[in-house]
Amino acid sequence: MDLVKQESKKKIGILGGTFDPAHRGHVSISKEAKKRFSLDKIIWAITKKNPFKGKSNLNLDKRIKYAKKINKNNLFIKVKYFENKVKSNRTIDLIKYIKRINKNAEIYFIMGADSLINFHKWKNSNLILSICHILVFDRDKYMAKSLNSVSYKKYSNKSIEFIRFKKVNISSSKLRKI
C-alpha cells in the first residue's frame, strides 16, 4: 500500500496598513509572529488609505518601495498592493482574495492593540474572525484600552490571540512628526 504524503497547511500572516512609513516595529512584529506561529510567509498588504485615519503623507509608490527596501533581508515578508486586484480596501475582501489563491492556507491577520479598539466597526468583522486567526500585538498605552473595548467584549470568545513581547518604541505617527 502506498502511503500518501500529506502536505501540511501553509500558514500565511497578513499585516495590513498604510505603512506611512514602514519601520522596524512592523519588522519586529512580523518576525515575532513568524517565530511564535510558524508562519511560512507574511504579506504586508499596503493600503492606499486607512478608512479610520486621514490622508497618508507619502504617496503609495514611495511607501511600497520603502517597505521593500527595509525587508530586503527578510525574505519571508512579501510587500504587496492588492486594491487594484481586489477592488476594495476592506480587510474582509483582502482576506477572501488571499484565501481564494491559497485555498488550503491558514490565515493569520496581524494587528496592533490600537486596531482592535475599532475592530467591531470594520466591515464584516464577525466573518473575518470566522475565516482567520487574529494576532493582536501589544502597543504602548493601547493594551488596556483594547481589553476594555467593545470589540474585545464582543469577540473575546473568538480566535483572538494577544501577544506581549519586547516593544519597539516607534510608530509611523511618531516618525511623521520628525
Predicted regions and their residues:
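Nucleotidyltransferase catalytic core that binds NTPs
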Residues: 1-178
